Design a protein with these regions (language model features):
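Hydrophobic alpha-helical transmembrane segments
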Residues: 15-19, 47-48, 70-72, 87-92, ...
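Membrane-embedded alpha-helical hairpins and interfacial helices in multi-pass inner-membrane proteins
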Residues: 87, 115-191
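Aromatic-anchored segments of alpha-helical transmembrane domains
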Residues: 22-30, 75-84, 119-128
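Alpha-helical transmembrane segments and their cytosolic interface
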Residues: 2-20, 24, 31, 158-201
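Short helix-perturbing small/polar motifs within transmembrane alpha-helices
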Residues: 27, 91-128, 183
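Membrane-interfacial segments
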Residues: 32-40, 64, 68, 100, ...
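Hydrophobic transmembrane alpha-helices
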Residues: 2, 6-72
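Interfacial aromatic-anchored transmembrane helix boundaries in multi-pass membrane proteins
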Residues: 34-38, 42, 75-100
Length: 201
């Protein structure tokens, strides 16, 4: 029992692995600034994240099958997002992910899929739905001045207007579907990668 518990503890190399892998998704996050082309691409950003970020998440889940790995991933993602509601939602997502993985088993595809979908939803809540819908009045109070000064993209303002309608429900559904598809793709990639490693050994 002691041996099992010891193997479940994160080591320095595990933390480094999680951090380096997380940086890949953080680069994707910052590169997404290229998507501020129009209001539609702005709204599609969390959908695109759901499709492409799963590979890194599953890589962490299959390489570091230990308690705390998913929490570290979420904390790093949240903090480097630099927006308090986004940070809070990501940290909450990290605890939810850890709970799910503890129940399903670390490395479980089912657990990774479920936790990934929830993480992407909570990330969208903190980064898109909260500022654009829930706190829109305060977030866009000085929108005109910010747009004029270049501190805010006009497409963000237009996207928020669109989102404050039935589109918000459609976006939630799209994020769930995209995240699930992203998880399926990631699962297949990881399965192929691991089987390839086993053959080479």
């Amino acid at each position: 029992m002691v041996i099992i518990m010891e193997t479940q503890k994160l080591k320095i190399r595990d933390i480094i692995t999680v951090t380096l892998l997380t940086l890949i998704n953080i680069v994707i996050f910052f590169a997404s600034s290229l998507l501020y082309l129009n209001p539609i691409t702005v709204l599609l950003m969390p959908v695109i994240y759901g499709l492409v970020e799963g590979v890194v998440y599953f890589a962490i889940g299959t390489k570091v099958k230990k308690r705390g790995a998913m929490l570290i991933y979420c904390v790093l993602r949240g903090i480097l997002g630099g927006y308090l509601p986004y940070i809070i939602c990501y940290v909450l997502a990290g605890f939810v992910a850890e709970f799910i993985m503890a129940k399903t088993g670390y490395g479980s595809v089912k657990g990774l899929t479920l936790s990934y979908v929830i993480i992407e939803l909570l990330a969208a809540l903190g980064g898109t739905f909260y500022p654009y819908v829930i706190a829109a009045d305060s977030f866009f109070r000085d929108a005109a001045a910010l747009v004029e000064s270049g501190e805010m993209n006009i497409h963000v303002v237009d996207a928020a207007e669109i989102l404050r309608s039935w589109v918000s429900v459609a976006l939630v559904a799209a994020i769930v579907v995209a995240s699930f598809v992203g998880a399926l793709i990631a699962g297949k990639i990881m399965k192929k990668h691991l089987s390839g490693m086993n053959k080479s050994v």
